[in-house]
Amino acid sequence: MTGRRTRLGDWGETMAARFLARRGYEVLARKWRCAAGEIDIVARHDGDLVFVEVRTRRGRDPGMAAESITNAKRARLMALADAFLAAHDLPSNTPWRIDVVAISVGLRAQEVSIEHIPYAVEEA
């Protein structure tokens, strides 16, 4: 990722974490990494672990974010959720889900749209 895209992605993850926290989510980790990859945000909400994929785009409809997750990315996110459970010695029946937070930034930085899509990624 280029420097500009990295900065935009980092900014988006910060905005997403704040957005979720304001809605009662407890943010447990950001940029959690293992050999399988990275989870943008790990949170807890209403007893569930919530793994959050953040999609930050410039000048695009935020609704396109969930559709932008390929089957390969879906499989990777599912594997990452399993890896997180294993790394933290959590039982396999721990309730969890994968959400998407889509952030769209307009041509002017003041034009920001945030959309939270619970259960956006499910097994195919």
From Swiss-Prot:
Q: Which domain of life is it from?
A: Bacteria
UniProt GO MF annotations: nucleic acid binding
InterPro entries, sorted: Restrct_endonuc-II-like, tRNA_endonuc-like_dom_sf, UPF0102_YraN-like
Do you know which SUPFAM superfamilies this protein is assigned to?
A: Restriction endonuclease-like (SSF52980)
Family per similarity comment: Belongs to the UPF0102 family.
Annotated protein name in UniProt = UPF0102 protein Rcas_2007
Tell me what organism the protein belongs to: Roseiflexus castenholzii (strain DSM 13941 / HLO8)
